[in-house]
Every structure is written in C-alpha cells, then in structure tokens.
C-alpha cells in the first residue's frame, strides 16, 4: 500500500484552513450560497453503466433513509477526503473500458488496480461510506470537459459547499472552481434517481489530463 504524500496532505490542510477562514469572514448571500452548491434543473436518465453495476452490487445501490443533511466539514472530515482521493488516484492506474473489458462502457470496482474515471469514483464512494460517510452526501456526477468528452467525478455534499474528488486532480476543489460543465448526478434522496444540473458555464481548459 502506498503511503500518503506529506506534501499533498499539507496542501490539503492549507485549502481546508482557507475554506474555514473564508466562511468566517464572508456573510452568506443568496448568490454565494448558489455558488457553493450546483443548482438542480429536473430529472435525468441514469447512466447505463450505473444500472448494470447495480445489477451486480445491490447493496451499494439501495436507497437508505437519510436526514438530508450535508456533512459538517470538520478537520477530520477533510482529512478523510484528502486521504481517500490521494490513495485511489495513486494506486489505481488509468485504463479505458475498451482496453480493460473490451466494452464501450462498464462500471466496476477497480479490484485489479485498473479502471477509468467511473471506477475511481465508485471506489472513493465505497471507501468513504466504509469510513462512516452518509451515502446521500456522496454523489456520482457526470461532467463535460472542454474537449466535449464526458467524465465522472464524485461530488461530496458538505456544509461548506459541494466538493469534487477527481482522478484528474490531486486537489479537492469546490465544484465552481473546477474546469468542468456539470451535467447530471445522483439524487440525494435515492442513488438510482438522477437529476440534471443547471450549470450554464462552458468547460474551461484548466484540468490536468491523467
């Protein structure tokens, strides 16, 4: 098992401190609250990869009762996010579904150490749930890159905003700080219900390829 990078952890804690400082000095406004969380704009179709994944992993797809609350972003919670994001990004090697499975689209846990973006997301979601994070705060999200290509990231719902865990970025950012246009994601009420996202921004050329 690869050890966590001290540099990444220190940068992660610096970001966390900056988030808390900004929250302390900035009075929330309606516009500011909208910027912290991407808006919803209706229902969407669940990706076929998710549907097929759930046919084999019922326990990871079932809806569970929840209080609808976002996670309090404490120092320990932030540490969980930084470590899980880094561990998965460092220990899973990128491989397309065509190379891996001979299929156009297949979502699976990267048990053999290889996977594409959805597989990174599935493992991060699983590890955080095993660490005690509520399922309804960990939402698989489909985004669009500047090239027009689709990509998947994990949205983490916290009381400080929607943060993104991404296999293309070691840093954990607010959704509005990333380069992507947000298309759809799982509903907080049921992981099998997907919702469209009201993100009018074009994708920007700031992501690092991986």
Where are these regions (language model features)?
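Bacterial N-terminal signal peptides that target proteins for export
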Residues: 2-16
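A structural boundary/capping signal
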Residues: 2-4, 29-210
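Short hydrophobic "helix-edge" motifs at membrane interfaces and signal-peptide entry regions
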Residues: 15-19, 47-49
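C-terminal segment of classical bacterial N-terminal signal peptides
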Residues: 21-30
